[in-house]
Amino acid sequence: LMFFKLIHRSSKSNARAGKIFTDRGVIRTPIFMPVGTLGTVKGVHQKELNDNIKAQIILSNTYHLFLRPGIDVLLDSGGIHKFINWNKPILTDSGGYQVFSLSNNFKIKQEGVYFSSHIDGSKHLFSPESVIKTQNIIGSDICMVLDECLPYPCDYSYAKTSLNLTHNWLDRSIIEFNKKNKAYDYNQFLFPIVQGGTFKDLREKSAEYVSEKQMAGNAIGGLSVGEPKEIIYNNVDIVCNILPMDRPRYLMGVGTPENILECISLGVDMFDCVMPSRNGRNGMLFTSEGSINIKNKKWERDFSPIDSKLGYMSSYYSKACLLYTSPSPRD
């Protein structure tokens, strides 16, 4: 079963073009995945996401879906695709990052992560096995292993201990995944995650360990928690020079246009980030000429389009129109 085909490699950088094959469609890479935390991308209708934005795949979050609507509802609905009426591929992250960033309190143990829901305080355990089972019920096309996402900065001793735990969790995740307890009749693919903080030897060790597993694709985690861009690029370069050429590489959570273009040149194929939708809701827009704050008063009589180079929606509304129709604190 072919999952990834490398179509072209740049002669000027490590950029490449390829295709990912899933039961729900082909994904052309490099690809940016809009984030739909609960399945749907905030502020965007599914038809617009498909027809205008032309999203080939979206990302949903295991932590949030586990808490609401819950796996029983998703199972009864026939999985996330039917629940949100989306017939293209979906990737789910493991939920580990959200446990560490959103939970009121959490404890990392060998067996997994104990945490309290940020919604109602209820207590739960995410183990490598339970996270695979949950994503199986969610029904995503690509699922992720549970890992520990380190803060930045982080000392070497803790990063080394954490990496050993993450690798142990990876092995357990693969064992559970290989049981093939599919909830639905289509293929699901598992990506391991390279961690190691910002330490070259740990990143190399993790990239080598992950590569040995020969999974369908590989992810690079822990580089969207506040690191300077030079550190991001350096670590991505280190990892991409080790990960196998014939598997897609997914850089988790990194999503400014500048970051994406630079990391494509380093050999990354897949990206996700909440930034486009979150920033858009708050008036910050990415254009082909840089980012603009549409709530700035200087746009109040600017009747030119947001960006005439970026398709229908960007050329349809003027800057002045968006300034006056954007939500403000008093609305």
For each feature predicted by the language model, list its residue ranges.
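Non-catalytic, usually N-terminal nucleic-acid engagement modules in DNA/RNA processing proteins
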Residues: M2-Y184, I292, N296-E300
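Hydrophobic alpha-helical segments that mediate membrane insertion or helix-helix packing
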Residues: D93, Q135, V210, E262-C263, ...
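Glycine-rich phosphate/ribose-binding loops and adjacent secondary-structure elements
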Residues: E176, K180, Q188-I306
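Cys/His-rich short segments
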Residues: D307-S315
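Conserved small/polar residues in nucleotide/adenosyl-binding loops
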Residues: Y324-D331
